[in-house]
């Protein structure tokens, strides 16, 4: 099975790329939604997170600029997300599975997990227009260096152009 990471900074267009992939029949693991589900379904996970970050769970969004709290959170949550993704991949039955995540690149928990990487990029002004919280959360992200991406999608035109780029990526990967 080929596992492909779709990454990019917040509001770059990862979700729209993955929506196109799903529309074409590819299984896509949405790490944000899946993580929220894990918080609700794993008994005691919220308490473990609170203990790790030293704050109430309701304040989890305030840790993005606190590197030590963010790393403590990642140490608790990322292994669970990775295990959940592996189960998803094993059960999807396809030859290719996509993993959507703004933060998986460069994290040791995900090293060696993906066969290919797709970097979705968009101009800063456009990302800020799409999501005004870009500034608040950007500190928690590291964009993949261009030379480490197997494929780059430049999301600076319309939706049809984005879909066309996804289609070209599929052809380039021969999947």
Language model region names:
Residues 34, 123-126, 158-159:
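Conserved nucleotide-binding/hydrolysis micro-motifs of P-loop NTPases
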Residues 84-91, 96-130:
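ATP-dependent NMP and nucleoside kinases share a basic, alpha-helical "lid"
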Residues 1-57, 164-175:
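Glycine-rich phosphate-binding loop of ATP-dependent small-molecule kinases
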Residues 4, 29, 116-118, 151-153:
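Hydrophobic/aromatic beta-strand patches that form the interior of the parallel beta-sheet core
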Residues 38-40, 127-133:
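Short, charged, surface-exposed secondary-structure boundary motifs
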Residues 33-95:
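ATP-dependent small-molecule kinase phosphotransfer cores
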Residues 1-2, 19, 58, 87-92, ...:
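Catalytic phosphate/metal-binding cores of nucleic-acid and nucleotide-processing enzymes, i.e., regions
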Residues 85, 93, 110-112, 131-175:
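Small-molecule kinase domains that catalyze NTP-dependent phosphoryl transfer to phosphate-bearing small molecules
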């Amino acid at each position: 099975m080929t596992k492909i990471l779709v990454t990019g900074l917040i509001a770059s267009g990862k979700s729209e790329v993955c929506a196109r992939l799903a529309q074409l029949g590819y299984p896509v693991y949405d790490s944000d939604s899946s993580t929220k589900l894990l918080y609700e379904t794993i008994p005691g996970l919220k308490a473990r997170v609170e203990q790790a970050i030293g704050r109430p769970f309701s304040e989890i969004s305030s840790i993005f600029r606190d590197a030590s709290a963010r790393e403590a959170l990642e140490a608790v949550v990322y292994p669970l997300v990775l295990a959940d993704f592996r189960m998803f991949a094993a059960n999807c039955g396809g030859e290719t599975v996509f993993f959507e995540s703004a933060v998986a690149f460069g994290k040791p928990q995900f090293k060696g997990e993906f066969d290919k990487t797709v970097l979705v990029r968009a101009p800063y002004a456009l990302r800020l227009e799409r999501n005004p919280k870009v500034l608040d959360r950007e500190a928690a992200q590291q964009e993949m260096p261009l030379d480490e991406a197997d494929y780059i999608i430049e999301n600076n035109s319309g939706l049809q152009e984005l879909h066309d780029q996804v289609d070209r990526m599929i052809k380039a990967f021969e999947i």
